[in-house]
Amino acid sequence: MRKVFIPLLASVPALSVAFLATLAPTSVRAVPSYARQTGLPCSGCHYTPPELNPAGRKFKLLGYVDKDKERPGLEIKDESKSHHAGLDLLSSLPFSAMFETSLATTKTPQPGTQNGNFEFPQDVSVFLAGAWADHVGSFLQVTYNAQDDHFSIDNTDIRYAKTRKVGGKDLVYGVNLNNNPGVEDLWNSTPAWGFPWIASDSAPTPTAAPIIAGPLAQDVAGIGGYAMWGDHLYVDGAIYRSDHVGNPQPNSGSGLGYNIRGVAPYWRVAWQQLTPKAQYELGAYGMHMASTPGAVVGLEDKYTDTAVDFQVDRTLFRKDVLSLRGTYIRENSTLAATFAAMGAQVSSHHLDTIFTNAEYHFGNRLSGTVGWFDTGGTVDPLLYAQSAVSGSANGNPRGAGYIGNFSFFPMQNIQLGVQYTGYTRFNGAAINYDGAGRNASGNNTWYLLARFIF
């Protein structure tokens, strides 16, 4: 799993981060160590991996600590009584591993490169995923990526959670440590855990993306608190600092597109309604960040993201599930630092991003998904500069298209997937978008994946 944050040189605008970082493969998994801990199959918490069902959302909310009652924690005996050790260790440590191999081909080869990229592996991951103690658990992933040829920390979510009664209803509350804004979320409608579930790491992707939709992933460290009241109202808040893993510490900011000044606050609120055959969620989330690109002092670029999202899961024909999801993100930014460095033609910018998708789960073995995405915003020939394949001839950040995915799970820990991504706009145009003769449709991508997790 490659990181979705792409470090930028100080002279490169901070907004020039791959838009499809938001469409890159995310780290959410049906991790077998959870199944071993709870005694449940993967379908106990997922419609089809990685989409969480109500039980899966509850398991995450409670800090990944629920256990099979037939497999108690480690007991220490003395002459007078038996009692649970304070660490409540499992009979086996909560480790899992994953192997992915893939084949990707674009309609038009990238200049000077071969088409049909076969990666064996694309990613190899190890997970520490499960209960650490009575109220503490984690989803922690370390990934080797063949493109980077090294291991790195991937999406990580460590929780402390408890429950009490408030107003006659259950209040679940907790503290969360994570490295990606939104990674703590319970639904699959927001960018951190959103569709597509798989994607090529070699195919071209559009340039522009809101900061809340991928550019900060695995490049920040955050702490926050969350609560769910009555299985209806969910609130979450966190603050983030830059954490440039793999770079010298203390941080100098050199060569990095985002260096958070102070802290960057993140907020989330959602309402869910549960019925015997359907679950509904409607929410909002956002983030504010001040950053000094390429340094830790000086003029600042400021970003404010505000978003709304929804998710509907409806059971059909007893075992099938239809899922509808979507989010709209508005980003307003003032790029004083980038403008002063002549990296932008104007200082005030905005981006508007929409992701929507519909998925049909045929039991827990097959799923088909169709998604649509669209990002547009302020035209700026310096911020979105011209270059072959990755640039824009007109300075327009528009990127739009569709994704079709079909996944088959012959066993609960094996996924075979085929996916097609088509572009109607790429970096501002459909025809000759880069000024070098490449069309948006030239980046249309077929992608095949085999994933094994155990």
Model-found features: residue ranges?
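Detector for outer-membrane/organellar transmembrane beta-barrel domains
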Residues: 278-404, 408, 420
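The canonical Cys-X-X-Cys-His
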Residues: 39-50
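Sequence/structural signature of outer-membrane beta-barrel proteins
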Residues: 102-109, 143-147, 165, 180-184, ...
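Transmembrane beta-barrel architecture of outer membranes
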Residues: 121-123, 151-157, 170-172, 220-222, ...
